[in-house]
């Protein structure tokens, strides 16, 4: 952007995204073949209806948890550049390097966390404990990071950015593994679909609300406080609203949902 303008950034990243098509198509072709082989010998089991999922407290818990995670994610993605330039005095070039490096940290931590939790479970650890500890650490840490960026010195604010990205990356495997465990093969697709539809409303709310708050106050402090509060909501969703992480008994839930005769 500094050397070639903002249009070049869209062109470059648009072209780079096309590189993903070839390996994705090859993997998809192999998966389709495997799915056909499994489906040929599988016994079809009906999925729970959408109405039953909407009555499930745990589904609303994961949706709230994802909304909370996504609020801070979209807040940072949309406003971190301006924050670094306007509030912390970085040049556009330095801002780009810092922001890019922080997302590299997020990606690496996502890979490491996925590997670590799988190894922990294979060695006899509890999926319930493992995933919930990670989600609690990520959301509790995000609260502290938002406060560090709002009120901290320059070094503390920069450290908070990188710690936040590391925690967000580490928690990302759980966002999809948890509904897979709870929903099982019968309900995972619908569960994740509802969860993502609700959770990604944060992508609408966070950029707009942040812009409104900055316009009204002239600084980022209140916006960071709101983001910290949203992170606390994630603790309610992931810890307060979820049962033990194991596949839910959909037959029992369906029977319980049937009204009894007067």
Question: Where are these predicted regions, by residue range?
Answer:
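Juxtamembrane helix-start elements in MFS-like secondary transporters
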Residues: 91-99, 131, 157, 192
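Intrinsic disorder in cytosolic terminal tails and internal cytosolic loops
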Residues: 35-45, 125, 242-262
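Interfacial helix-cap and linker-helix signal at transmembrane-aqueous boundaries
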Residues: 1-4, 84-85, 116-117, 121, ...
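Extracytoplasmic gate region of multi-pass secondary transporters
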Residues: 56-113, 168-176, 206
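C-terminal transmembrane helical hairpin of 12-TM major facilitator-type secondary transporters
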Residues: 128-175
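Helix-loop-helix hairpin linking two adjacent transmembrane segments in secondary transporters
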Residues: 1-32
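A late C-terminal transmembrane helix in Major Facilitator Superfamily
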Residues: 110, 180-219
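Juxtamembrane intracellular "pre-TM" segments in multi-pass secondary transporters
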Residues: 31-63, 87, 259-261
């Amino acid at each position: 952007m500094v050397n070639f303008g903002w249009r070049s950034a869209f062109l470059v990243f648009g072209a780079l995204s096309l590189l993903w098509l070839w390996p994705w198509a090859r993997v998809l072709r192999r998966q389709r073949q495997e799915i056909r082989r499994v489906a040929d010998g599988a016994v079809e089991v009906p999925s729970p209806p959408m109405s039953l999922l909407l009555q499930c407290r745990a589904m609303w818990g994961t949706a709230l948890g994802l909304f909370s995670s996504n609020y801070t994610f979209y807040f940072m993605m949309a406003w971190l550049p301006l924050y670094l330039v306007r509030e912390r005095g970085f040049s556009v070039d330095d801002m780009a390097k810092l922001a890019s490096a922080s997302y590299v940290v997020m990606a690496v931590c996502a890979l490491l966390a996925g590997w670590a939790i799988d190894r922990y479970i294979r060695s006899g650890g509890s999926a319930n404990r493992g995933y919930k500890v990670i989600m609690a650490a990520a959301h509790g840490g995000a609260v502290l990071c938002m406060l560090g960026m709002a009120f901290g010195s320059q070094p503390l604010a920069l450290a908070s950015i990188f710690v936040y990205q590391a925690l967000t990356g580490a928690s990302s495997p759980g966002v999809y593994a948890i509904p897979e465990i709870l929903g099982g093969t019968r309900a995972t697709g619908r569960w994740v679909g509802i969860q993502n539809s609700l959770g990604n409303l944060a992508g609408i709310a966070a950029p707009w609300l942040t812009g409104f708050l900055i316009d009204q106050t002239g600084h980022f402090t209140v916006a960071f406080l709101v983001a910290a509060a949203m992170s606390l909501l994630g603790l309610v969703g992931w810890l307060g609203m979820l049962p033990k992480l194991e596949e839910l008994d959909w037959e029992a839930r369906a029977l319980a949902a049937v009204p009894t005769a007067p």
